[in-house]
Structures are given as structure tokens and as C-alpha cells.
Amino acid sequence: MTNKEFYNKALSESSPIKQVGWENEVKAIKRYKQIAKLVPPKTHTIVDYGCGIGNFAKYVSHSAKYIGMDTHTEFVEFANEINPELQIIPTDGKGNVPECDCLVSIGVWTLRGELDDLQYWNNIVIQVNNMVKHVTGSIIINGFHNQADYKDPKLYYHDISKWIKLANLLGLKMKVLVFEKFEFVIVLKK
């Protein structure tokens, strides 16, 4: 099943959390709340890169201008139908984002599809390199780390040491937090 097929199938689900492929609604809400706490208090504009249908917006849009972005056009169209007050726009998936104070990428780099780990990581590096040019504050990234007990072959498991090298290469400060048993959150700052 391709990524597009996976997300088209997910969109037909009844729960907003399951519509973007998250299996556990309680964990997803907990994830959103914890990541929202990491958004710096004086953030004026936040980009939600890979926003799905904009579920994260309700945790941050009261305190900052929210811009959701997704490569999946069906998500963007549906999100704009159900959240007309939000700005949700398509992205080319190359990390080209509008100017912002903070960018969040929640679970975006998890479903690797047909790419091998090296190809997938190189794609992430290109995206983050482009993002850094447009983000004045924090970049907050959530995903699965490679120390997980069980690994689904369809998913990508991040090697935190690669993130450390990338942060150093880009001149960024980095903080790593463990979320749940096999998830991490990385906060990158200039």
C-alpha cells in the first residue's frame, strides 16, 4: 500500500484522529498536548508541517497564527471544509515553508513507503535544511526512535545520533525528549 493509499483509506474513518492514520486517540491527544507545551510562549506564527486535517490547531491556534501544511491534497481540502477559520495549504514536501517563529512536525517522518532508510533520511535532511531558512525560533519534531522493541517494516525509526549530527551541521541547539515508550520529540533552535 502506498502512502497515498494509506492516507486516503484513513480519511474515510469517522474519528478525526484516525482520519490521519493515528490508531490511538488517547495517545494522540496526549501527544498534541505535550507538544503544544513545547511551543515557546511568545510565538506569533506556527507552521504545522504535515498537519493532516489540522487536529493540532486547537492546541495552539488560540495563542498564535496557525498555518497547516500537508502534501496530501485530500487532507488539505477536507481540513479547509471542516476548519474554514484556519489557514491550511498544500506543500510540495520539500520543506519549503512560510516564515514562522515555530514549526511542528508531528509524526510526519514515520511512514516511509517504498524508500529505504538511507533514502528516507536524505529526504528528511533536505526538508529540514529548507525549513531552517524560514523558521526564526523552534522546530519541534516527533517520531519513532530506533530503540523501539518492535519495528514495523513500513515505518521509519529515527537514529537520534543522526539528528545530533544534523543539528551540529546546521548550527542548531538540540534537545531530545522521550515520549511514550518508542517515541521522541526533538526541539531544534537557532
Region roles according to the model:
Residues 178-190:
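Core SAM-dependent methyltransferase catalytic element
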Residues 135-144:
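Conserved beta-strand signature within the Rossmann-like core of class I S-adenosyl-L-methionine
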Residues 95-103:
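A short acidic, Gly/Pro-enriched loop at the edge of an enzyme's catalytic core
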Residues 53-87:
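Class I SAM-dependent methyltransferase SAM/SAH-binding core
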Residues 102-121:
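A short SAM/SAH-binding and catalytic strip from SAM-dependent methyltransferases
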Residues 154-170:
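Short alpha-helix
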Residues 1-38, 43-52:
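Conserved class I S-adenosyl-L-methionine
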